[in-house]
Regions:
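Active-site-adjacent beta->alpha loops and helix N-cap segments on the catalytic face
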Residues: 37-49, 103
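Glycine-rich, aromatic-flanked loop segments that form ligand/cofactor-binding clefts
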Residues: 48, 52-56
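Active-site acidic/histidine proton-transfer and metal-coordination neighborhood
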Residues: 50, 67-164, 174
């Protein structure tokens, strides 16, 4: 189990030539980010290569899974995002599922149908798609996929091992709590974690989530993947207090 750093959260507006050596100095060799279309991809590619780092994942762009009329646009965006992933030697893409359509059961069927349409692209491009539930109470009102075990049941119906769950500990603490039980129940589908303090999405130790304990228990469950650090350091940039958790 290792950490990756979300550049958009920890290093907003910081030049990659400054951010990546800082991350390397902290003993972390893996980064992730949100959107690719607003980035200087040549500069990112150069900085990652020079600092011998891995791009773990980033978000696919275009279309909406919860809206059937948008599935063709979604698949086109997935194709384009796949080419960017290959350029960055990245094997994982993050997807959100889009807005609730009014009928939740139908919304889930729409998402399931859209995800099943991704099979051919993911197989051909040798990629993993990470589906992310989000909280609707604070950050994403109207979002379609909220609860971790509902997401796991959805992925079981989709039935493609290349389509996995992104379990965001911050979002799930707000949405449902009881994190370790939900992690244990969802573990066969989890391909990535995100972490942030439950208080204002700040430092990991800000709020009621005991992250040192949480990370230890997740590792004991047998998880060998990555935990993405997606917290916002309260007006500062970079790690600062992260070493206390390592």
């Amino acid at each position: 189990m290792k950490y990756s750093v979300c550049l958009d959260a920890l290093y907003p507006g910081v030049d990659l030539a400054q951010a990546l050596p800082d991350i390397r100095e902290a003993g972390i060799d893996t980064v992730e980010f949100w959107n690719w279309s607003n980035r200087d991809l040549a500069a990112l590619e150069k900085a990652v290569t020079e600092n011998r780092m891995e791009v773990r994942c980033f978000c696919t762009e275009g279309g909406t899974l919860s809206l059937p009329q948008s599935h063709d646009e979604y698949l086109s965006g997935l194709e384009h995002s796949a080419q960017i992933a290959h350029r960055l030697h990245c094997r994982r893409l993050i997807t959100q599922t889009g807005p609730e359509t009014g009928d939740h059961a139908q919304t889930l069927r729409n998402i399931e149908e859209g995800l099943k349409k991704c099979d051919e692209i993911l197989e051909r491009e040798d990629l993993i798609l990470l589906v992310e539930p989000l909280n609707t109470r604070i950050d994403h009102p109207g979002y379609s996929l909220v609860y971790s075990e509902e997401a796991a049941e959805l992925l079981e119906r989709v039935g493609n091992p290349r389509i996995q769950l992104l379990f965001d500990l911050y979002h799930q603490q707000i949405s449902e709590g009881d994190l370790l039980r939900h992690v244990q129940n969802c573990l066969p589908w989890i391909g990535h974690f995100h972490a942030a303090g439950s208080q204002n999405r700040g430092y990991l130790e800000d709020g009621e989530i005991a992250y040192s304990y949480m990370f230890r228990k997740i590792k004991e469950m047998g998880y060998e993947g990555c935990i993405g650090l997606e917290y916002f350091p309260n007006g500062e940039r970079g790690f600062n207090r992260l070493p206390e958790l390592k």
